Amino acid sequence: MSTTSAQATAVVTGSFLSGAMISLSLMAVPVLLDTTTEPTQLFFQWRRMYHYGHQVLPTMAVATTLLYAYTASKRRRAQKPSWAVFALAGTITVSMIPFTWLCMVPTNNVLFGLEAATRLGEPSGMGIEEAQALLVKWSWLHFTRSLMPLMGAILGSLGETVWN
């Protein structure tokens, strides 16, 4: 694969990744909030949305990062200073994974716990407003995480012009 092709593919996959992620916060979560009247249903729907996102999005982040790493490696071997921009683009893109572990896991665990409890018929102990507030918190964290591959794509697209 040529370096230019790897760079272009990384930018496209990073942009697609960010768009797919942002659509969850900007479209899917608002639909859940507008159409769900019971905490049990809200937790179940969130878990399904999380499940499908988890199937695809982390893998895309790693693949995008590997494409940036390949581009950075080829540029470095060619002694082009722009290699550092591509290395940074990859690092920023994959930083969504440790962000998830450090910032989102507590909220995720609460949501997973509430979904599991209500699935077993136990009361959640919260009304719909509290459940919605928890989902809004998750949505803002997820939106923040979604910006990381976007920042990587912006850097990746400007790589040669930023530092050549």
Curated annotation (Swiss-Prot):
Subcellular location: Membrane
TM stretches of this protein: 11-31, 48-70, 85-105
Keywords: Membrane, Monooxygenase, Oxidoreductase, Transmembrane, Transmembrane helix
Primary localization: membrane
Entry keyword annotation includes Transmembrane: yes
GO molecular function annotations of the record: monooxygenase activity
Pfam families (UniProt xref): Anthrone_oxy
Membrane protein topology class: Multi-pass membrane protein
InterPro entries: Anthrone_oxy
Pathway: Secondary metabolite biosynthesis
Catalyzed reaction equations: emodin anthrone + O2 = emodin + H2O + H(+)
Keyword Amino-acid biosynthesis part of the UniProt annotation: no
Listed EC numbers: 1.10.3.-
Stated role: Anthrone oxygenase; part of the gene cluster that mediates the biosynthesis of agnestins, dihydroxy-xanthone metabolites. The pathway begins with the assembly and cyclization of atrochrysone thioester by the non-reducing polyketide synthase Agnpks1. The atrochrysone carboxyl ACP thioesterase AgnL7 then breaks the thioester bond and releases the atrochrysone carboxylic acid as the first enzyme-free intermediate.
Family, as annotated: Belongs to the anthrone oxygenase family.
Protein name: Anthrone oxygenase AgnL2
Originating organism: Paecilomyces divaricatus
Phylogenetic placement of the source organism: Eukaryota, Fungi, Dikarya, Ascomycota, Pezizomycotina
